[in-house]
Amino acid sequence: MEREQFSGRAAAVAIFLLAASTAFAGEEALERELQRLAPLSGGVMGVGVVHLESGRSAFLNADEPFPMASTYKVPIAVELLHRVDEGELDLAQMVEVMRHDYSPGSGILADLIREPGLALSIRNLLEIMLLVSDNTATDLLLRHAGGGEKVTARMKALGIEGLRVDRPTLHLIADWIGLSPVPGEAERDPAKYDEIFESAPTDESREAERAFYDDPRDSATPRAMAALLEKLWKREALSPESSDLLLDVMKRCRTGAGRLKGILPEGTEVAHKTGTIGKTLNDVGILTLPNGAGHVAVAAFVKKSDLSEEKRERAIAEAARTAHDYFLFTTK
């Protein structure tokens, strides 16, 4: 492992020197390094990188759509907070969480709503959605944001093409495993979902999974996600207050320690959101460089990979470290 890390860092230093010698005429050196790293993912990898102060950027598979998985919770949060900015919603507004609101997958609310009676504020739900990627909180907030169409329309209003939100997580996961029809409200039970997930795959579920990775719904290109992160950081997507709130919550994200943050220098501040479903593994966020060198938005996606989660995470970690070091060494 140490030898692998050394060789990776040595290669990174080499591209920094090359970039410096070309007086920053484009970021071809960084793009070549991202291309070199891509096979580590074991599948199709997409990366969007933007140095936020200078606008310098580099991409790998820039305009290829990737399933967002839970990274789509960032655009959902943007539309939700836009409604707060417009006075249509209040962060203190309480939302009752009922048993039939349960959505399977990641999160903590499933353990709290086996009996009715729980109510949380929109701000509480926002933090749970982003900090621990809670799917029940996500679906409740997507409803308050007006649904996927409203989120997608908001992205287009910001000038972002290539990012769309279509389904609540309940339906997204159901499509991934080939569960049809989606259970009605009376049938939404955590134990029942656990039984479905633990059952052996069938021909139908395998076919559903294969189709899932090419489904245009709930997908984003690396260019589009990087653009959203850039607008969020520049306070162009939301009011300064809402922008600060969202970025603060993303800095406290509790998932994905081995992804964007995986091999960055200790103490590097990262505001990010992860996403994982099947053969898809993602992490998108903003890195703070040391010594006043600025900030870097990184949107990293992997799809159609049969490698272990650890190995896919390593590919994203290498891409993030490469972007971090590149701009650290080449920013004047």
Question: Where are the predicted features?
Answer:
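Structured C-terminal helix/loop/strand segments within mature extracytoplasmic catalytic/sensor domains
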Residues: 27-35, 148, 210, 214-332
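A short small-residue
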Residues: 56-57, 112-114, 207-210, 300-302
